[in-house]
Amino acid sequence: SSAASDVYKRPVRESLDSVYAAHAAGKHLADDPLFKTIEPATLLYINYEALCAKTSHPAVGMAALLPCFWVYDGLGQVFVKAQKKSRLQKNPFADWIAGYGSPEYSAEVRQALGIADALAAETDETVKAEMTSAFLTACRMELHLMEAAWRGLTWEPVAKPH
């Protein structure tokens, strides 16, 4: 459906907008070490979402994307409340994170959930089971992504051959 297509395209548009904004501000992301390498947990997660979206029923692809929307909506809500009570306003990512706690973003999340429900209603039990599996796997990957960031997990250095 067109609405599902829009939900798939939104994160891509946001990412491109961020790159363009950084470039317009004179920041060159290619020079930033944070952007030189995609970390393992991120690579695993985005490839899993892409695999589900590309090779599975559209409902399964949508289910694989939902944890990202839903988790960030919840985290955004918590952050907005915490921001009012603490020094989190000084966090350099405060505005970006607070955007995930906005009523507009929550409305988009509800739209994504509605699309997933509508897609599920049109499928059989086999596809619904695949949706559940994709959703739970993506939830685990979301947790792993955050844990990896918290613990600073990255690629192991590759030794040069002697």
Where are the language model's segments positioned?
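Acidic, carboxylate-rich catalytic segments that either coordinate divalent cations
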Residues: 129-162
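Short, small-residue-biased leader/transition segments that mark boundaries at the very start
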Residues: 1-8
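Long amphipathic all-alpha helical oligomerization modules
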Residues: 102-136
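Active-site-proximal alpha-helical scaffolds that flank and shape metal-associated catalytic sites
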Residues: 9-107, 140
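Hydrophobic alpha-helical segments
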Residues: 72, 79, 115-122, 138, ...
